Amino acid sequence: LGDVYKRQVQPQMREVPRNMGIGSGVIITEDGYIITNNHVIDRSDKVMVTLNDKREFEAKVIGTDPDTDIALLKIDANGLQPIEYGNSDDVVLGEWVLAVGNPYNLTSTVTAGIISAKARQLGGKMNLESFLQTDAAVNPGNSGGALVNAKGELIGINTAIQSPTGSYSGYSFAVPVNVARKVVSDLKEYGKVQRAMIGIKMQELTPALAKEYKLKEQSGIYVAEVIPGGAAEKAGVKVGDVILQLNGYEAKTFAQLQEQLAQYTPGNTVQMTLSLSLIHI
């Protein structure tokens, strides 16, 4: 893990005026594109980036996405060392991770922990919620920093903590990198995020609902309504079907389904695994 620290602690982002706040960021290209959190730079008049070698740059805000709390910055620099991407879909519970950032202005701080949960929701603080949960210590100033695996690959952007005091109390949360990558790609190409929809109204299935609807599945996404003309209708999805997977990944909760859909653009084709209702027979 020590080698991971040396290779991956690259970007440190600061907001100006400095008494207004500080955060972290992740260099993703050699020519100066940086991911951070939207809440770090929101409402700022000027954003300054300080690299690990103490060079400072004024950053241009390329775009922001409050729904996922992701922002994309650009600095006028070349020859930077970008981080390598991992695959957040393949992260497993108990996997060791490192959180990198500037807690309390303590630059280049690295803490270790494990993945405690996936597809975690925090009660609707953001419109799209499907976080990686970890017990790596994250505090004010870590926002926008990297969550990396044991190979030093980026698997998430540290975003939130669950705490009554505002400081770390055992749980921290990161936006999955697969979601962040898609947001960044859209911000660069379109200036805003292109949201994919499948055209249904849905309920998250519980054993009680399964009993009420006389369904064999005890968990999944119950299709309560199919929107006329939408992608689901065109694919033959019916009311009463239960969504289980999207492109081979589990999608049995709202958070899991949101996380998978957030990786796609309108017009993309996805494979959906369903438990069919009797309407199909």
What do these predicted regions represent?
Residues 240:
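Conserved catalytic motifs of ABC-family nucleotide-binding domains
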